[in-house]
């Protein structure tokens, strides 16, 4: 899938080195195919890493995608330069009158705070409310999934006894849903979190459907209102070394973390980690874009979304 991005976005060069098809604005204009308009609310601290991870994941289906990155104006990033955010990110005020085919809300390292204690919570719920009328389908990742479940469905989050970190086995729970089409019966996916959405509250809500579950990591994928909202509790976008970097960062902070599960060969943190979830992640993004975005969204984004949202 070709992705249209700004010509000078830092991720562009690395994507091209990996033979991922990206195009700049000039080339995209010459094509007579409407791209899918995807907006990414990037709440992760090192935004360039998440940009690259998500763009990789979105690059594997045969449709052109136009990606817009969204920031929270009420939060000042400590790990990404203001110049990068100013150059490559839009504010909500700048995009609030637009419609989008799809939206991704990322995770954020704020799990131990109550939702209302997060300094951009009010702005985030404004964005989530706006998405009901302006976005065909939204996929929420990790803390973004917990926040979305809390806002849209009142699902509370719970503090885990210790950090859940590693790559865990999951099983498909509902084969009839297109989102899990092509998934193996048992597949691997990474997690890195201190909290979880209440399992019982999810199971008790008739508007929510569990599509993938894990004995060790808990509920993984939840479908809301037939696909209007999708909640992914882990981090399928993570690169091979992301958990490694987080683990060593925690050691440097004196946290004494447990070794990520099912990650290092022979549990040796000096060896190259195993990448066992890439095909699952690619399948997840492809199915979302195809079945919950492309086949649902109006060709003319100016049309009323009341007639098209799932």
UniProtKB/Swiss-Prot annotation:
GO terms for biological process: L-methionine biosynthetic process from homoserine via O-succinyl-L-homoserine and cystathionine. It is an enzyme of class 2 (transferase). It is found in: Cytoplasm. Pathway: Amino-acid biosynthesis; L-methionine biosynthesis via de novo pathway; O-acetyl-L-homoserine from L-homoserine: step 1/1. Its EC number is 2.3.1.31. Keywords: Acyltransferase, Amino-acid biosynthesis, Cytoplasm, Methionine biosynthesis, Transferase. The record marks 192 as: Important for substrate specificity. Transfers an acetyl group from acetyl-CoA to L-homoserine, forming acetyl-L-homoserine. This is Homoserine O-acetyltransferase. The lineage of its organism: Bacteria, Bacillati, Bacillota, Clostridia, Lachnospirales.
């Amino acid at each position: 899938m070709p992705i249209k991005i700004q010509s000078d976005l830092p991720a562009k060069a690395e994507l091209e080195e990996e033979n991922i098809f990206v195009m700049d604005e000039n080339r995209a204009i010459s094509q007579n195919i409407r791209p899918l308009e995807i907006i990414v609310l990037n709440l992760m601290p090192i935004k360039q890493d998440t940009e690259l991870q998500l763009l990789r994941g979105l690059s594997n289906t045969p449709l052109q995608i136009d990606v817009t990155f969204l920031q929270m104006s009420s939060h000042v990033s400590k790990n990404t330069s203001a110049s990068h955010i100013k150059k490559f990110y839009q504010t909500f005020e700048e995009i609030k009158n637009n419609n989008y085919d799809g939206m991704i809300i990322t995770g954020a390292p704020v799990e131990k705070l109550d939702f209302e204690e997060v300094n951009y919570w009010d702005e985030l719920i404004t964005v989530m409310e706006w998405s009901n009328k302006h976005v065909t389908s939204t996929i929420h990742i990790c803390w973004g999934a917990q926040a979305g479940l809390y806002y849209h469905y009142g699902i509370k989050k719970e503090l885990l006894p210790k950090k859940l970190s590693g790559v865990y086995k999951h099983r498909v729970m509902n084969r009839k849903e297109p989102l899990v089409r092509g998934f193996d019966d048992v597949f691997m996916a990474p997690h890195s979190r201190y909290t979880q959405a209440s399992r019982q509250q999810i199971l008790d809500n008739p508007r929510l459907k569990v599509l993938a579950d894990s004995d060790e990591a808990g509920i993984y994928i939840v479908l809301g209102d037939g696909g209007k909202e999708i909640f992914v509790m882990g981090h399928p976008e993570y690169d091979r070394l992301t958990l490694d970097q987080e683990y060593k960062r925690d050691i440097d902070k004196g946290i004494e973390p447990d070794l990520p599960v099912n990650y290092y060969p022979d549990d040796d943190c000096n060896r190259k980690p195993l990448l066992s979830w890439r095909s699952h992640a690619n399948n997840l993004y492809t199915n979302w874009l195809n079945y919950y975005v492309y086949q649902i969204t109006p060709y003319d984004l100016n049309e009323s979304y009341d007639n098209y949202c799932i």
